[in-house]
Each structure stands twice: as C-alpha cells, then as structure tokens.
Amino acid sequence: MRHGNSGRKLNRTASHRKAMFANMAASLITHEQIVTTLPKAKEIRPIVERLVTLGKRGDLHARRQAISQIKDQDAVRKLFDAIASRYATRNGGYLRIMKAGYRQGDNAALAVVEFVERDVDAKGAADKARVAAEAAAAEAA
C-alpha cells in the first residue's frame, strides 16, 4: 500500500530524480522559463517555490539550504539578489504552468513553466553571447 507517499516517481531512481529536479530548478532560475513534460512541471513547482521563499528569507542559513538543493552558485546568487526582491510582496504562487501541446516524437504532454512576473530578457551566458553575435551580424549586413 502506498498510503501517504506523495509525488511522482517518473520512472527514475531517487538520486536521479533529485539530480534532475536540481538541474531543472537551476535552469528555471537562470532562464526564468523552461519547457518540460507536464508531470515534471507539476513536480518542480513546489521545489522552486520553496527555493524562492528561502530567497525571500535572505539569511545565511537559507542561502546554504538553497545551495544544498540546487548546487549552482550563480543560480543561487540570482535567486537571492534578483528574484527574491521581485516577489517580496507576493505570498506564494511564484510560478505559472501552461500546457504547450504534445511532443512530436512520443506524444508526451508538454508544459511551459515560468515565473509569474518574469524578466523577458533573462538569458544564460550562452544565450546572451548568441543574441549579441546575431545583433552584430545584423548591423554589419
């Protein structure tokens, strides 16, 4: 019997699930929007919302708790500096999950997970370099 066992297993071991959610949370904090399958999106929401609440607390212990969960110093820095201040007056509900159709290869239900008041220009370093190169090429042409 599975009484009281909440959460989806997603056909992964516990360590794989933990690592996957840590990577997804870091990507979501860095890019402020990700596309994933609907069950993964529903599972990542409480994890990231808890991290944003830690960011709003802002003390050293909260920062260490966040680092122990996502292992990405840059994402934690952005979480505590930019994202926490953005949601200082909001009590929960920091993420939005929108259904995004079905994946062509296996017909899996997709979803877009994004921050409610997200920064549209938030991109990772690779994306910033690519956008800058495209802009420079467009001006040169």
Swiss-Prot record:
<dbReference type="InterPro" id="IPR036373">
    <property type="entry name" value="Ribosomal_bL17_sf"/>
</dbReference>
<keyword id="KW-0687">Ribonucleoprotein</keyword>
<dbReference type="InterPro" id="IPR047859">
    <property type="entry name" value="Ribosomal_bL17_CS"/>
</dbReference>
<comment type="subunit">
    <text>Part of the 50S ribosomal subunit. Contacts protein L32.</text>
</comment>
<dbReference type="GO" id="GO:0006412">
    <property type="term" value="P:translation"/>
</dbReference>
<protein>
    <recommendedName>
        <fullName>Large ribosomal subunit protein bL17</fullName>
    </recommendedName>
</protein>
<dbReference type="GO" id="GO:0022625">
    <property type="term" value="C:cytosolic large ribosomal subunit"/>
</dbReference>
<keyword id="KW-0689">Ribosomal protein</keyword>
<comment type="similarity">
    <text>Belongs to the bacterial ribosomal protein bL17 family.</text>
</comment>
<dbReference type="InterPro" id="IPR000456">
    <property type="entry name" value="Ribosomal_bL17"/>
</dbReference>
<dbReference type="GO" id="GO:0003735">
    <property type="term" value="F:structural constituent of ribosome"/>
</dbReference>
<dbReference type="Pfam" id="PF01196">
    <property type="entry name" value="Ribosomal_L17"/>
</dbReference>
